[in-house]
Structures are given as C-alpha cells and as structure tokens.
Amino acid sequence: KNFGLYRERTGAMTLISENEAAAKVATTQIAAAARAMYSMPPDHGAAIVQLILSNDALRTEWDTELTEMRDRINGLRAQFVKQIQSIGIDQDFSFIEREKGMFSFLGVDVDQVQALVNDHSVYLVNSSRINVAGINDANIEYLANSLATVLKV
C-alpha cells in the first residue's frame, strides 16, 4: 500500500513455521488458495514496485514522499490528541499519538460511532476506525468537539 497501488494486487506474504515440512504444507495450501482466486496473478503493480526500488532516483523520491506522509500523519495524530486534551475530554486518547499508520481506532462503542456518523457527519466504521490522513486543520476541532459530544451522552 505504500506505493498507492491498491487495485494492482501487489504484496508479499511472510510465513513462519516450526520446520521445513510444515512450511512446505503451508506453501502448498497458500498456492492452492491463490490459484482458486486467479491462475495467473497480475504483474503490473509488482513491475512498478520493482522499477521504483531498483532505480536510485525513483527510490529516493519515493522514500522522500513516504517520509513526508509519515511525518504529516504523525503530526496529525499529535494535533488531534492535543485538541482532545484542550477541550477537556476525560478519557486518555494518548494512544492515538503512539500508534503508527493511516488509521486509528477511537475505542468508542457502536452507538457512539453511529452518533458521530448520524449526528455529526463524521464518517468511520463501526469498529471506530478512522482515517487519520483525512484529518486536517479545517476539521480537527470539529472532530474533537464531535467526539466530546458523543462521549458525554
């Protein structure tokens, strides 16, 4: 996903097993599952990744962009937690700042999620997973205030 190739079916699977025999059995089962989905996996995404990683200039550009995005998301996490704390939410949401990646779970229940969606137009899934990358200066205060409102109900 770091390459933004969501529809290209790129990826890797790592298998850890107790011994070589178990690894062979698991590999056979994984291959059978892959064949059931498609007999010839697409190569376009993998070819793009290979091109980027094998070219020093492209790899440097990709790494720079990835670092910028990671720093942006980490900054958003910190800003969101600071905003939550500044409005006086009693619960500890500092875990959001310590997490990694584009998504975070708010740890609210399904009724609170539905209140965020229906009453505040804050969109997240029932598990309370939000896309941190979707937070910005224009909506961070609204998001924190909406969260505070549903937590008080």
Region locations from a protein language model:
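Short, well-ordered loop/turn and helix-capping segments at boundaries between secondary-structure elements
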Residues: 16-17, 54-58, 86, 149, ...
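Active-site PLP attachment segment
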Residues: 1-25
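Active-site-proximal structural scaffolding
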Residues: 4-8, 42, 73, 109
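A structural signal for short secondary-structure junctions
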Residues: 42-43, 95-98, 124
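PLP-dependent enzyme catalytic core of the Aspartate aminotransferase-like
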Residues: 82-86, 108-153
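Conserved PLP-binding catalytic core of the aspartate aminotransferase-like
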Residues: 61-119
